[in-house]
Amino acid sequence: MNDPIKKTLTVPLSAQEAFDLFTTEMDTWWPKASHSVKGEKSKLSFPKHKGDPIVETGEDGEDAIWGKLIAYDPGKYLAFSWFPGRDEAEATVVEVNFTQTEAGTRCDLTHGGFDILGPTADAVSTSYLHGWDLVLGCYAGATKVPALT
């Protein structure tokens, strides 16, 4: 059984601003040059309604579904299934908690459910362990004051 990946990041924003940056503004900071299905010039859209997809639209107008929204509590919490470039039957789960602190907002990301991937679970989990560092570094960079722990 694979342990979930846990990453913590503090950003100098209110909880609502941090949440909005992570969701509705994802296209502005996500490292599409290295972490994309459709390429660097694609567009990302993050849903606001349970069951709706996280979509990457390529230059050719074709969509790739990265996951589906499970929970959406603005400024506090979100959860989504995650399967970019894979079949939905192989979806893992990402959860992000946004907690207001004196320093800004602590963002606690947990990515789990890798066992569904069978024999590739360890390799995929290890890839995401490092991949989230880059992704969250880009997210922090969009706030101008990165502080990944």
Question: Where does each model-flagged region fall?
Answer:
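Tryptophan-centric aromatic hotspots in well-structured domains and transmembrane helices
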Residues: 29-30, 72, 82, 128, ...
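Hydrophobic pocket/interface hotspot
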Residues: 18-22, 54, 69, 80, ...
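Hydrophobic ligand-binding cavity/cleft-lining segments
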Residues: 1-43
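Short coil-to-beta transition motif at edge beta-strands of beta-rich domains
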Residues: 47-54
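Aromatic-glycine hotspot motif
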Residues: 1-19, 57, 92, 99-108, ...
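A conserved amphipathic terminal alpha-helix motif
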Residues: 112-149
